[in-house]
Amino acid sequence: MIVKTDEELQALKEIGYICAKVRDTMKEATKPGVTTRELDHIAKDLFEEHGAISAPIHDENFPGQTCISVNEEVAHGIPGKRVIREGDLVNIDVSALKNGYYADTGISFVVGKSDQPLKQKVCDVATMAFENAMKKVKPGTKLSNIGKAVHATARQNDLTVIKNLTGHGVGQSLHEAPNHVMNYFDPKDKTLLKEGQVIAVEPFISTHATFVTEGKNEWAFETKDKSYVAQIEHTVIVTKDGPLLTTKIDD
């Protein structure tokens, strides 16, 4: 989507704020003893309060308001009976629509303290990779510069990127052009970023793996070697002044 009017911009900011509020409220509630289904109910209540609709349910008939992935799960984890434990690596991915406009955001974090420092490391490096990618977001620059920055950050920290999970265009649907915002450099991709373009940027940083495979059900993705993976995602509008993150709530 290319934002052309202030009405479109405000609508994107509104759904971005709603998704960010859901994400942050769920993260705050992620404590040892809570189930992923209980966390998902928080999203249901907040979506209803703000007049928004879960995109996974609306677009994909997904069996949950949000995707909650724990430890060996990388993405598209189904909320259910799973109990959160101290030291778990958790990813919460929230996407929704309101009045025909979408936002998509995600965060990975460690619950409490873990005796496995690599869990926190992949989270920290995912954040670093996202921040470095944002330095490349300007009209007229190559889309592939985002992936180059993400991959470089991973390598500098002796980590890898997941190559078959990518960002994407977003705005008037959950997935639209550009179909892929890679987390590595693709020299064949000559796509240029445009003023007002809306994209979801989501680095997936791993301890060892470079690909995910289907997991325990038809939705969840896992790595074959059970590598830890962390994701950070925001909905980003390309502007001449730099990236505008609709899913970031200012402190």
From Swiss-Prot:
What biological-process GO terms show up in the record?
A: proteolysis
- Cofactor(s) in the UniProt record: Co(2+); Zn(2+); Mn(2+); Fe(2+)
Catalyzed chemical reaction(s) = Release of N-terminal amino acids, preferentially methionine, from peptides and arylamides
Cofactor: binding comment: Binds 2 divalent metal cations per subunit. Has a high-affinity and a low affinity metal-binding site. The true nature of the physiological cofactor is under debate. The enzyme is active with cobalt, zinc, manganese or divalent iron ions. Most likely, methionine aminopeptidases function as mononuclear Fe(2+)-metalloproteases under physiological conditions, and the catalytically relevant metal-binding site has been assigned to the histidine-containing high-affinity site.
* Protein residues bound to a divalent metal cation 1: 93, 104, 233
One GO MF annotation is: metal ion binding
Bilayer-spanning residue ranges: none
Tell me which residues bind substrate. 76, 175
* Keywords (A to Z) from UniProt: Aminopeptidase, Hydrolase, Metal-binding, Protease
Keyword Metal-binding recorded: yes
EC assignment: the record states 3.4.11.18
Gene3D superfamilies assigned to the protein according to its UniProt record, in alphabetical order: Creatinase/methionine aminopeptidase superfamily
Statement: the UniProt record of this protein carries the keyword Protease = yes
Specify which residues bind a divalent metal cation 2 according to the UniProt entry for this protein: 104, 168, 202, 233
Q: Which HAMAP family does the annotation name?
A: MetAP_1
Spell out the family assignment given in the record's similarity comment. Answer: Belongs to the peptidase M24A family. Methionine aminopeptidase type 1 subfamily.
Main function: Removes the N-terminal methionine from nascent proteins. The N-terminal methionine is often cleaved when the second residue in the primary sequence is small and uncharged (Met-Ala-, Cys, Gly, Pro, Ser, Thr, or Val). Requires deformylation of the N(alpha)-formylated initiator methionine before it can be hydrolyzed.
Q: How does it assemble?
A: Monomer.
Q: What is this protein called?
A: Methionine aminopeptidase
What species was this sequence derived from?
Staphylococcus epidermidis (strain ATCC 12228 / FDA PCI 1200)
